[in-house]
Amino acid sequence: MFPYQPMYPMQPMPFRNPFAAPRRPWFPRTDPFLAMQVQELARSMANLTFKQRRDVPPEGPPAKKKKKDTSQQGGRNQNGKKKNKLVKKKKKTGPPPQKTNGGKKKVNKKPGKRQRMVMKLESDKTFPIMLDGRINGYACVVGGKLFRPLHVEGKIDNDVLSSLKTKKASKYDLEYADVPQSMRADTFKYTHEKPQGYYSWHHGAVQYENGRFTVPKGVGAKGDSGRPILDNQGRVVAIVLGGVNEGSRTALSVVTWNEKGVTVKYTPENSEQWSLVTTMCLLANVTFPCSQPPICYDRKPAETLSMLSHNIDNPGYDELLEAVLKCPGRGKRSTEELFKEYKLTRPYMARCIRCAVGSCHSPIAIEAVRSEGHDGYVRLQTSSQYGLDPSGNLKGRTMRYDMHGTIEEIPLHQVSLHTSRPCHIIDGHGYFLLARCPAGDSITMEFKKESVTHSCSVPYEVKFNPVGRELYTHPPEHGAEQPCHVYAHDAQNRGAYVEMHLPGSEVDSTLLSTSGSSVHVTPPAGQSVLVECECGGTKISETINSAKQYSQCSKTAQCRAYRTQNDKWVYNSDKLPKAAGETLKGKLHVPFVLTEAKCTVPLAPEPIITFGFRSVSLKLHPKNPTFLTTRQLDGEPAYTHELITNPVVRNFSVTEKGWEFVWGNHPPQRYWSQETAPGNPHGLPHEVITHYYHRYPMSTILGLSICAAIVTTSIAASVWLFCKSRISCLTPYRLTPNARMPLCLAVLCCARTARAETTWESLDHLWNHNQQMFWSQLLIPLAALIVATRLLKCVCCVVPFLVVAGAVGAGAYEHATTMPNQVGIPYNTIVNRAGYAPLPISIVPTKVKLIPTVNLEYITCHYKTGMDSPAIKCCGTQECSPTYRPDEQCKVFSGVYPFMWGGAYCFCDTENTQISKAYVTKSEDCVTDHAQAYKAHTASVQAFLNITVGGHSTTAVVYVNGETPVNFNGVKLTAGPLSTAWSPFDKKIVQYAGEIYNYDFPEYGAGHAGAFGDIQARTISSSDVYANTNLVLQRPKAGAIHVPYTQAPSGYEQWKKDKPPSLKFTAPFGCEIYTNPIRAENCAVGSIPLAFDIPDALFTRVSETPTLSTAECTLNECVYSSDFGGIATVKYSASKSGKCAVHVPSGTATLKEAAVELAEQGSATIHFSTASIHPEFRLQICTSYVTCKGDCHPPKDHIVTHPQYHAQSFTAAVSKTAWTWLTSLLGGSAIIIIIGLVLATIVAMYVLTNQKHN
């Protein structure tokens, strides 16, 4: 490849010291014979150690032990080491090895670092269990005990361990026994610590995540049961019992240990035991191992197909199918030659509804088309075959087809496939073809050979299926990775099958000819032909292998020649007739099935976000139609789900509980509003009104309306009283001629006196004529002075309105409290115990899991309609056999006239009958693309807590059930039960594509056609399938062999189109929904009761802690409704330096610090969070209390990306300034009313006194 010789790295030259080396001290020389004995003993021990693993060599090339031994034996002497080095050097200088296998060099995979480490540790601690000379599983020695899987039969390959008497633990599928004392020093250690990450076992790395051990698919198989899984320190974390394939990975069934050292078994659904049990098959009432059949296909093809048919339901069918393709003595083919089983089949001709001109019998008839992947690929099933030559040998990029009984081939690049535009053919194997096609409403396949064009078209809507939340039409170059389903580009065995059977007889008129007055039949070479003739009154029916002449008949129309072949299978197509008698069925693997993968999805441009007061504005400009989903993070999610196709602006309200939006394939974004608003709660009246109007618009409007009504009422009442008093006062003087009104009365009633008098003269007149009015006049200033004094007192001495959210009581040795179930929000409290210093307790929940108990009812997927080849009886009647398959329909049609490519099938015209059968089964892609219907029951709650008690911190996993305690540092903690038995999951839930939906699905066995659950199976691999698809058979068209039918569309596909957003986007309280296992995390609902049992050792005597002699608290800065936006400075004088707990007994403020360091004199800074505008709280430091109070200002940011750390149930107080202005307003209104009342009283007294005097 390169024009220059490759350069290999040279060995570095040794460093030469320019100074002479010191002489080595002399030691007495050891006996060479004794050294050789020690070396031989060490070598023998190493061989004994590794001999236990010779039956199962590791992955990679076998070790060249023989060459090494011979070289050592040939040069074994006192200078043996030098000889070995010379031999190695000679090997390097020898000629390079010649390439074999057509120039392909086999790449040997060497064991990795993990495998080498496990092999080294397993060598003398893991022992194979032998059964019939084969390794059936393994036993390992862990912690002084021998563990072996209960399901593994056989004898341990160790004399000491095999003689031990074991005890059975069927619950854990284990047998165990105590190992002898002499072996306990060299055993595995075990651990319950299993942080998420990667561990090691015999085959490499094991991933541990969400409580599950998984390995890549194909790593590990039967025979690995009992192998240990080790951590980096060589400790056993689990023992493997089995596994189950889940897409691209295999989930392991293991036995492990929990924190208490109790054995726990975890088994995934549909898990298989990995003991190497030999599966037996049957041939003529004789059993044999499925992997060792007595016959093979190349030698006895017909008998082999019969054997496969009789074992079609055997669990070892795949082993038998693989074994019959390899006859003993034949060389093994390359591992790249996959799916050799299709040499058991042959192509066929079938009717195509739309050829170049009308319908025809086409060699490339299209049977089925599927395009369910997310990569734009289409999988076709045709009557032609791919990857095989006419003789049945593997030949890549080749198509073979049946042309009137003759199998021909054509290069695959000469075959065209197109929809609206040409397709790109990826590969083909067997009856299946994989291609990438543009969108279109039909698909056409054609090729041309010898100036003849063969084509076939079928109606099928081909379109690109995007994955994710953006409806793109072409895969992007860059973006995010998401799980998806794609068609595998190889032909590996992935558990999907297609049904085969022996073909029926095919009429071939080309085999008939006339010679004189007789009919001549010429069978093809190596084939048998069934001849049926009706010549006059003579009926002939026989099978011939060579040419034969029938003189009884003179016309070819009197005879039918049927091709018969019992050594090849064909697809069980409705376009082919069924063979007479018992049909030998089989099944072969389907290539190019759907698999799980990672697809690149586009990311829509990020929205332009504008924050407002309790609102968010999103300016969206998508490139593709993109979904926008929003929800509130409280009990009422009020979610929205909208497909945005054009640039738009959407406005949403945000509350203190939180709001979340998901834009396309971007991760969710959450926002919380803060209690911010324009204006100033401590400013002038208009600023106060503006502030409260934005925060509480309805309450502010109502309050202002009430104040305005009070002021208006007071003014109106005062005016009315004044007018009434004036009229009552002036009326007597108006009726008296030349009456003179006193001066004081004229002033009160706003009337002009008859003559001008001084104040003294007026008082003298009242004293002489009306003393009651005199004293009333003197009381008016006194009343005004009293009112002014009381008003001033009310204005200056207003008590602010504070709401106390609650107090946290402190117990003693046994402490109980309640913590809000909100992740990330710290909860601080203290324990006050007589004679001891307060003990601070801080708890921060990092994760809270709600795991429901679920029961899988069934799985549903896209169904596949299976149609048996129609059974045609010429000139006779038939009856349907009993039906036993899902939704199977059977119907007999009379008066059919079938016709094949070789001519008419029957002699009769109207007496022929046809049995049509159709049924429903799971699609080949059901293993990957399916939905699971669960019933959910009581949920368990698991909390991950960061706990600090005093100076001791730990991380604990607590089951919130009120029963299961957790011990750490002597502290015993019991949590739960949760204050509310709430769950986001309904009684019926559906899991699809890693997401959970609340859906009321029909019960098992009660599905409806065209709805979810129209096809049901207990598990993916179970055979008990129920279906209801409204399958109705129709009468076949005359002149064609086919099975027409009508059927309801797939309810599963319709549900996928109509399904609402999953719980991931709609769950209340901000729950995060996950699968494997199904769970909800971090739901901010309810509270968690906690009970602490604290030992005496964690308490500190009061005498050993500092005490404060003086303390003064000042609020330096305070921003309410913000995360620790308050800063308090406490100046103190302490008895000595030390550490003290700080706490606020009330819920007015939440402290960031749980303890502070104190000096003998100084100040401490404490951060707090509050929702109060004018906070006033008592701060406990050690055993002393100090009061902190001040004014808080609103936060500057309207929206933040994190929740508030204070109690959200706390309602903010009305500021002191607002109360001052409010009381002033009400006080002014009261003065007006009081003045009116005083005037009315004075006038009334005067009128009454005057009338009495007169």
Curated annotation (Swiss-Prot):
Which stretches of sequence are listed as region Functions as an uncleaved signal peptide for the precursor of protein E3/E2? 275-286
Matching InterPro entries: Alpha_E1_glycop (IPR002548), Alpha_E2_glycop (IPR000936), Alpha_E3_glycop (IPR002533), Alphavir_E2_A (IPR042304), Alphavir_E2_B (IPR042305), Alphavir_E2_C (IPR042306), Flavivir/Alphavir_Ig-like_sf (IPR000336), Glycoprot_cen/dimer_sf (IPR036253)
Provide the reaction this enzyme catalyses.
Autocatalytic release of the core protein from the N-terminus of the togavirus structural polyprotein by hydrolysis of a -Trp-|-Ser- bond
| EC number from the UniProt entry | 3.4.21.90
A GO molecular function annotation here is:
serine-type endopeptidase activity
Would you list which residues are glycosylated? N285, N651, N946, N1082
Q: Where do transmembrane segments lie in this chain?
A: 701-721, 772-790, 791-811, 1225-1245
Cite the residue spans of the region called Ribosome-binding: 111-125
Extent of Basic residues compositional bias: 79-93, 102-117
Q: Where is this region: Host transcription inhibition?
A: 33-68
> Could you say which enzyme class this protein belongs to?
hydrolase
- Region labeled Interaction with the capsid protein — which residues? 724-728
Phosphoserine PTM positions: S123
**Where does the record place the region E1 fusion peptide loop?**
896-913
Where along the sequence does the record put site: Involved in dimerization of the capsid protein?
A: Y199, N232
Sequence ranges assigned to domain Peptidase S3 in this UniProt record: 125-274
Keywords assigned:
Capsid protein, Clathrin-mediated endocytosis of virus by host, Cleavage on pair of basic residues, Disulfide bond, Eukaryotic host gene expression shutoff by virus, Eukaryotic host transcription shutoff by virus, Fusion of virus membrane with host endosomal membrane, Fusion of virus membrane with host membrane, Glycoprotein, Host cell membrane, Host cytoplasm, Host endoplasmic reticulum, Host gene expression shutoff by virus, Host Golgi apparatus, Host membrane, Host nucleus, Host-virus interaction, Hydrolase, Ion channel, Ion transport, Lipoprotein, Membrane, Palmitate, Phosphoprotein, Protease, RNA-binding, Serine protease, T=4 icosahedral capsid protein, Transmembrane, Transmembrane helix, Transport, Viral attachment to host cell, Viral attachment to host entry receptor, Viral envelope protein, Viral ion channel, Viral penetration into host cytoplasm, Virion, Virus endocytosis by host, Virus entry into host cell
- Intrachain S-S bonds: C281-C290, C352-C456, C355-C360, C423-C437, C484-C599, C533-C559, C535-C553, C729-C750, C861-C926, C874-C906, C875-C908, C880-C890, C1071-C1083, C1113-C1188, C1118-C1192, C1140-C1182
Lipid-anchored residues (S-palmitoyl cysteine): C729, C749, C750
Tell me the residue ranges located in the Extracellular compartment per UniProt: 275-700, 757-771, 812-1224
| One Gene Ontology CC term in the entry | viral envelope
Query: Which parts of the sequence are annotated with region: Binding to the viral RNA?
Result: 91-126
What else the UniProt entry mentions is:
Belongs to the New World alphaviruses that can cause fatal encephalitis.
The domain comment in this protein's record states: Structural polyprotein: As soon as the capsid protein has been autocleaved, an internal uncleaved signal peptide directs the remaining polyprotein to the endoplasmic reticulum.
Protein name per its UniProtKB record: Structural polyprotein
